Amino acid sequence: MRLPNSRVLELPEQREVRGRAFPLVLGPDGSFDPAACRDAILGLARDHGGILFRGFDVPTPEAFATFVETLRIENMPYVGGAAVRTPIVGDRVFTANESPPGEPVPFHHEMAQVPEPPAYIFFYGDRPSVSGGETPIVLSHEVYSCFLEEFPGCCEAVEAHGIQ
């Protein structure tokens, strides 16, 4: 599957997971209409586990909110998380991390504590960081598969207690 008016880019941090680039990195190649590409965007996100859109015309948090809304994905309120989140645009765009700049950012497991976590999570960088600024992402189901393979007894014990 290919996304119209985009080109595939590469990053040194990318990994191959089950034969696919993670995350898939796309740059613009002509005019881009996310609403017209909705099915392709969501399909590529499912196939690759994540898409990094690099260089597209999304200059403000409001433009980012519009981009997300054009994909017609159910909005899930941020409930029960330990991190501080400040609303930026309505109930769709929030700060992701309000830790001091020197603190490392752990992997995001957004709303892992709820029975039905969101199928899609979107991140937006409003201002480039002077240094650092990375947001690490991981495919939780791949981590679980590797952990299950390496430590099956531990996984069985945890699952027996009803912990997910």
Q: Where do the protein language model's features map onto the residues?
A:
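Non-heme Fe(II) oxygenase catalytic core, chiefly the N-lobe of the double-stranded beta-helix
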Residues: 1-164
